[in-house]
C-alpha cells in the first residue's frame, strides 16, 4: 500500500522520501518514480527505531527543504486467539503498528512546525473501529491505538497548523493480505463480510490518503476516513 501512496503522491507533484526495512523493494519504487520524472529518495527505516526516524526526517529536510506530510503506513498482521497469543507476539505487532506511528509522529512534528504546518496521515484499519473474530487481539488493539493517538495529536497541534487524521481500510489487495487471500476458506469468509463483495485495491486507499494530505482537507483534523467496502456499516 505504501508503494501505491508514493506513486500517487509523486504523480501529483510531491517530492517523496520512502522508508522501509525492505531495501530492495523500496529502492525499486523510488527508482521507478525518478525514471518517470518524479523526485524520490529512499532511506532504510525500521519504524521501531528512533535513530532511523531521525535519519528519515533529516533526509527529507536536507534533500527537499522541508517536511510537510507524513504518512505512517508500516504494519504487520497476525491471526490468533487471546489465549494463544504470546507476549512476544503481542509486542511485535504493537511495536510496529502503534509504537512506530508514535515515533514517526514524534520525529516529524518539529520539522513540520519549522515548515509552518503539515499533515500527518496514519493508516489504521477498519478493525481499529470494530471487533472481529478473524484477526488477533494485538492487531485490533494496535489499530485502535493508532486511531486515538491520531486524535490526541490533532488536538495538541491544531493551533500550530499540524493536522492529523487516520485512514481505516478494510481488506485490501496487498502483500500483507496475500496469504489470507490465497486460502480459499479464509478469503471467502472475509469477502462475505464486505457488503461490496470484493477486496479493495491499494490505489483506492491511496486516493483517500492524498485527500487528507492535501490543502483540500485544510479543515479536516482528528477525523477517520473509512475505506472498507461497507464493513463497518453493518
Task: Give short role names for the model-derived ranges.
Residues 1-17:
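Canonical Rossmann dinucleotide-binding motif of NAD(H)/NADP(H)-dependent dehydrogenases/reductases
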Residues 81-82, 89-91, 190:
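Substrate-binding pocket helix/loop in short-chain dehydrogenase/reductase
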Residues 105, 142, 150:
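Active-site helix of classical SDR
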Residues 110, 155-156, 218:
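Alpha-helical segment proximal to the catalytic Tyr-Lys
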Residues 125:
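Residue(s) in the substrate-gating loop at a strand-loop-helix junction
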Residues 130, 208-210, 221-234:
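Short C-terminal tail/terminal secondary-structure segment
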Residues 158, 163, 220-222:
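Short, small/polar-rich loop/turn modules that mediate ligand/substrate recognition or access, typified
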